[in-house]
Amino acid sequence: MVAPGSVTSRLGSVFPFLLVLVDLQYEGAECGVNADVEKHLELGKKLLAAGQLADALSQFHAAVDGDPDNYIAYYRRATVFLAMGKSKAALPDLTKVIELKMDFTAARLQRGHLLLKQGKLDEAEDDFKKVLKSNPSENEEKEAQSQLVKSDEMQRLRSQALDAFESSDFTAAITFLDKILEVCVWDAELRELRAECFIKEGEPRKAISDLKASSKLKNDNTEAFYKISTLYYELGDHELSLSEVRECLKLDQDHKRCFAHYKQVKKLNKLIESAEELIKEGRYTDAISKYESVMKTEPGVHEYTIRSKERICHCFSKDEKPVEAIRVCSEVLQVEPDNVNALKDRAEAYLIEEMYDEAIQDYETAQEHNENDQQIREGLEKAQRLLKQSQRRDYYKILGVKRNAKKQEIIKAYRKLALQWHPDNFQNEEEKKKAEKKFIDIAAAKEVLSDPEMRKKFDDGEDPLDAESQQGGGGNPFHRSWNSWQGFSPFSSGGPFRFKFHFN
């Protein structure tokens, strides 16, 4: 269904045309209109006035079928086509009107308008000149003269645009073409010429816009679809590239360049889709391998290299391989300093490496470009908590393990340190006190890091054994006394209070 506002707008644009229809309401007799045709014409006119374009069109189709030599039927059908934005369909009807009634200046004037919009300047000028020679009304004469002046200006601008293009002055050519296309809005060739200028000037997205318009204005425009596909490909948009090259092959399945390009895009698209599926499954090493294949498949297109590295950076970060993640993310950020995805992934890698200042800096930079991203906000808050925590007691440092250490590594480190710092090993009173404090920290670290829930709290910047951290202040940092840890074996897999442990 056509929107009422759209209908009003389109009818308004052909309003002078509709006035002519009113003048024609009594001319049916001149054409020898039979009763059925007259009925279709009158009903169609009422429906058109009411904005019911599809229904009006059906009536005028019936009128044309009933009397193929009735110029009024063709004229009114052309009016509906124009109101529906179907100028291509209107043009043959207007031509038929002129064939049937050569002195019908309104139809010739309207055809001149359409030809001018299509950029067919010589044909448009011919219509306007014939209008002036056919005893036009005062308004028709003024309109024809005005359009002749406009057409002459378009001829001059077109010549200047072509000269500028031939001289490789693409900026000047674009300026001239901009002015022409304000009038000759349906000129496919000029849009394609401007697209070439945009490509030369490094503005591929503007070129795509013109080429898309051209693909609709010109039938079977395989060349436009091919160029759109290659431009999307060079921009790194493999999905849209694949979609556009398929449109080319729908028009001509034997198109050599489109078919060759289709095979290349399809291969790349399959690799990327496979890699993304592996990422969803958490198979990061396999995904990295796929993206490395993407870079080998299309080394000549920079966009695929940088996008592949961006995803490899993400995989390393998620796979908790911080050194590799930082290296690859940094390569991306050297080229694209504001790449939010790479900033987030590198920040996560910095957290694993306990480089909190660097993580905070990356999160803050990312937030400048995407302030509403919840992941960035939460990451920044976590990094700030961990920085503050690192200035207090750090259980990972106490045991000498990395933040991504497995439970087995934590238990192994704990046992080694517990044996080393057990107070029973020290006879000197001062050394014993120092060992007691050290042993308490070691045991606390083991308790927190071997318990998944407590470890998660600590990883989020909260010390589960610190009253101040737990309650937001108001208490002293929690340290268990040596007495509370006695009877606790570093080799026990259960809780801390099994039996007294002695070294002999």
UniProtKB/Swiss-Prot annotation:
Keywords: Chaperone, Disulfide bond, Endoplasmic reticulum, Phosphoprotein, Repeat, Repressor, Signal, Stress response, TPR repeat, Translation regulation, Unfolded protein response. GO terms for cellular component: cytosol; endoplasmic reticulum. Residues 451-481 are annotated as: Disordered. Residues 375-393 are annotated as: Flexible linker. InterPro entries: DnaJ_C3_Co-chaperones, DnaJ_domain, J_dom_sf, TPR-like_helical_dom_sf, TPR_rpt. GO terms for biological process: cellular response to cold; negative regulation of endoplasmic reticulum stress-induced eIF2 alpha phosphorylation; positive regulation of translation initiation in response to endoplasmic reticulum stress; protein folding in endoplasmic reticulum; response to unfolded protein. TPR repeats lie at residues 37-70, 72-104, 105-138, 154-187, 189-221, 222-255, 268-301, 306-339, 340-373. Residues 1-31 form the signal peptide. Interacts with EIF2AK4/GCN2; this interaction occurs under endoplasmic reticulum (ER) stress, hypothermic and amino acid starving stress conditions and inhibits EIF2AK4/GCN2 kinase activity. Interacts with EIF2AK3. Interacts with EIF2AK2. Forms a trimeric complex with DNAJB1 and HSPA8. Interacts with THAP12. Involved in the unfolded protein response (UPR) during endoplasmic reticulum (ER) stress. Acts as a negative regulator of the EIF2AK4/GCN2 kinase activity by preventing the phosphorylation of eIF-2-alpha at 'Ser-52' and hence attenuating general protein synthesis under ER stress, hypothermic and amino acid starving stress conditions. Co-chaperone of HSPA8/HSC70, it stimulates its ATPase activity. May inhibit both the autophosphorylation of EIF2AK2/PKR and the ability of EIF2AK2 to catalyze phosphorylation of the EIF2A. May inhibit EIF2AK3/PERK activity. This is DnaJ homolog subfamily C member 3. The gene is DNAJC3.
